[in-house]
Amino acid sequence: MTADNALYIPPYKADDQDVVVELNTHFGAEAFTAQPTRTGMPVLWVERARLFEILTFLRNVPKPYSMLYDLHGVDERLRTNRRGLPGADFTVFYHLLSIERNSDVMIKVALSESDLSVPTITSIWPNANWYEREVWDMFGIDFPGHPHLSRIMMPPTWEGHPLRKDFPARATELDPYSLTLAKQQLEEEAARFRPEDWGMKRSGANEDYMFLNLGPNHPSAHGAFRIILQLDGEEIVDCVPDIGYHHRGAEKMAERQSWHSFIPYTDRIDYLGGVMNNLPYVLSVEKLAGIKVPEKVDVIRIMMAEFFRITSHLLFLGTYIQDVGAMTPVFFTFTDRQKAYTVIEAITGFRLHPAWYRIGGVAHDLPRGWEKLVKDFVDWLPKRLDEYTKAALQNSILKGRTVGVAAYNTKEALEWGVTGAGLRSTGCDFDLRKARPYSGYENFEFEVPLAANGDAYDRCMVRVEEMRQSIKIIDQCMRNMPEGPYKADHPLTTPPPKERTLQHIETLITHFLQVSWGPVMPANESFQMIEATKGINSYYLTSDGGTMSYRTRIRTPSYPHLQQIPSVIKGSMVADLIAYLGSIDFVMADVDR
């Protein structure tokens, strides 16, 4: 890291600094190599031989790091700006989160290409299972001791590991694809479920089990998603979620797009989240660039993000009630979504995927008359939410299908990496907009809805109350919108203000280069998490000092939420699974990326 870059590195929070002191005291400072980054958290490299005991210590320390927030890898072989870092061909990183401390720490381990293996940590955090499978799938890194190390995103017949730097990034770099009859039969056979591979028995002491495919094309699966159910009659003995059907290689595409041109791709992660997807990405890029946006930009971003929180929750509400048998409410919620999209389209020019946030600002200023459109919606929705609560959510049939169904507690939620409404429905008061305010959320008055039972019904009610709080936030944005520019006055703001290109040739040249070639970001690492529609979403960016990201890690909330399914639904009925799936509120693009 260069000295100039180090000037922008923020100090750790007190709680983050405390864990560094605890680690140094217990293991000795020589056990760690600290990496200065712009992630805002301690990043510590450790030897592979000590990784397991260090992670175990963090899992059991007072005020523990109860959540394995993320685990993934980096191919370091082409990275040029690595001064001061341990030698590595590949890196595996472990991002840990402590709710009690409101603290993060990242542990990294360096690997050589000749010895790509790290001990599994599934005995410490159960949600490491899928993350380790994905790292093996994408990079070919082995995890000895893993219960079932197999492909998870790519088909079982896939050859190669796509996130390696020597793996082609475009279809034109591969041989033409053809599907012969023999190959089709091979693919079909590879998809066959074999219970023995997953430690399941085909029969018990007095019964034969039935194995049922739910999906990958089933309306209650909410996307291309398969769950193989082991059934004893209607009772679910065990199940295996099968994902990856929607995988498009979003993290690989980020390595071939400029920092600016990748923004539209973020919209397609949680495709119901709209600009909510743009926010963690542009905030992370702005950390790399050292950009501080004007106050007006913060308020506009918050207002539009909350609009998309509402549209996403309205879709959830209508389809969830439909999943348990009530057909009418979905038409009402779609009417309300249309009213929201009328406002969104008037402001951004688009509906579902505006790709409207920019590095350093937003695409353009608010249009004339935007206040009336926003006010009309703010006045409209609360009365509709009252109707939904009275007519549908207090319905005895819906309650009978959801109260006490698929319940889990805070401890279980944290162990599986659950965030958002799923975590808060257990009574855990953790909302990033309050706990770690970003983009100026600390300037707004709103409450964090909580529940106590952690069941399917509570998850629904938390989201309904979140819509009420979003309305309060939008109303405050409307009433207190600051004056000022909609883009930061910074050399790396992309694109720079258009009006200046008509007056200054230097600005015109910069505009041309940044749009066509892309802005050059300082070599460093940055990270930003936000409270998205489905839970916590984050972007962890690695810049090698170029116009494109060296590595973009997209951590989505829906991924761990689906991994949790077997632990929650065993012993329940198939009908309970349908109610549970609806209450999770996921989209498969958010899972598969």
UniProtKB/Swiss-Prot annotation:
It is an enzyme of class 7 (translocase). Transmembrane segments: none annotated. InterPro entries: NADH_DH_suC, NADH_DH_suCD, NADH_Q_OxRdtase_suD, NADH_quin_OxRdtase_su_C/D-like, NADH_UbQ_OxRdtase_30kDa_su, NADH_UbQ_OxRdtase_49kDa_CS, NDH1_su_D/H, NiFe-Hase_large. Residues 1-184 are annotated as: NADH dehydrogenase I subunit C. Its main location: membrane. Pfam families: Complex1_30kDa (PF00329), Complex1_49kDa (PF00346). It catalyses: a quinone + NADH + 5 H(+)(in) = a quinol + NAD(+) + 4 H(+)(out). Keywords: Cell inner membrane, Cell membrane, Membrane, Multifunctional enzyme, NAD, Quinone, Translocase, Transport, Ubiquinone. GO terms for cellular component: NADH dehydrogenase complex; plasma membrane. Residues 208-593 are annotated as: NADH dehydrogenase I subunit D. The keyword Membrane applies. Its EC number is 7.1.1.-. It is a peripheral membrane protein. PROSITE patterns: COMPLEX1_49K (PS00535). GO terms for molecular function: NAD binding; NADH dehydrogenase (ubiquinone) activity; NADH:ubiquinone reductase (non-electrogenic) activity; quinone binding. It is found in: Cell inner membrane. NDH-1 shuttles electrons from NADH, via FMN and iron-sulfur (Fe-S) centers, to quinones in the respiratory chain. The immediate electron acceptor for the enzyme in this species is believed to be ubiquinone. Couples the redox reaction to proton translocation (for every two electrons transferred, four hydrogen ions are translocated across the cytoplasmic membrane), and thus conserves the redox energy in a proton gradient. In the N-terminal section; belongs to the complex I 30 kDa subunit family. In the C-terminal section; belongs to the complex I 49 kDa subunit family. HAMAP family: NDH1_NuoC, NDH1_NuoCD_1, NDH1_NuoD. This is NADH-quinone oxidoreductase subunit C/D.
